[in-house]
Amino acid sequence: MPEHLSPREILDRLVAFPTVSTDSNLALVDWVEAWLAGWGIASHRVYNAEGSKAALYASVGPDVPGGVILSGHTDVVPVEGQDWHSDPWTVIERDGRLYGRGVCDMKGFDALALAALPLALEAGVKRPLQIALSYDEELGCTGALPMIRAMAAGLPRAAAVIVGEPSMMKVVTGHKGGHSFRVHLRGHEVHSSILHEGVSAIMQGARLIDWANRMNAENAARPATELGALFYPHWTTLHVGTISGGTAENITAKDCSFGLGFRVVPGEDPLDWVARLKAEAARITAEMQAVHPDAGITLEEKFVVTPLVPEQDGAAEALARRLTGDNAVRVVSYGTEAGHFQSEGYSAVVCGPGDIAQAHQPDEWLAVDQFAAGWQFMQDVVKDLCR
């Protein structure tokens, strides 16, 4: 028998699962799968290599092309170290806001999308409504591509993808791409009084970080491209967020590692930036090995987030603008899974409830009126699919 749940009741269920990216999401997937099965809606899983996490997708309606995909992710960021004033795994409504980890990013949208499936079933849509729920979005959208490719192989191709990251229900047509590396440096230890006989992994790493700073300065000084001018900032940025290494102050560091990330403006080739990084690392490595042959630099690729490029006459943009009435041009500098959908041949935009400023914060919240606006959008999507 189907279990009739409101969007808010579904949100309560989803938030109760602590699906931090470092942990499994299978308990949540089990619940979603069982709830959909109660409505007679079949769902499909796409597991990670270890079988510890899964993406889930489902479809309601006839097996014809031209439908709509509602895309969200199941994982959330940790709450450790944050000062919460209520249980982060229980949705609390207070002063027109819904509080809880993931309510904004992005279980609020997930709940609305799930609630829309029985609505589409009962309405008898003429084109399918599909849902896509990924894992590891917060770790670099690493769970998205296998899911997207499975959907492309197993379902009729949708005309539009709505990725429901928080945008205040405004239509976002472009975002920067992301490329993340962990840089590992191997040095050669000697007493720091004879520094010239050793190789400090930290000091050599600082040279690569200085290169990143110089690239930022050069990029900022260049005039914006027509597409780049839409973004803030309008240039590709390089950033080092974490670093570790060394043994003692009087020993040249035998190791150093740091995270280096790119946010690439659409229109620039991310692989060109990778080539530049590799060339600079090779140049520094050669100088390190001139002192000691075992010294060097290894680049470990962590993830790639494909940029979302504004489309000419895109079906997803046309649908989202028609249903929201929003015709302003908007792009963002953070990444989403919309770029991956677009790279696989889908028309995609970002449009979802909530403000990105609330994502990842202690006492994360979603305005009740945004949740209501998102539900109205879902109802309008279903009506559109009935035409």
Map each language-model feature to its residues:
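Glycine/serine-rich anion-binding loops at beta->alpha junctions
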Residues: 96-112, 351
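Acidic-glycine-rich active-site phosphate/pyrophosphate-binding loop
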Residues: 79-94, 158, 173-185
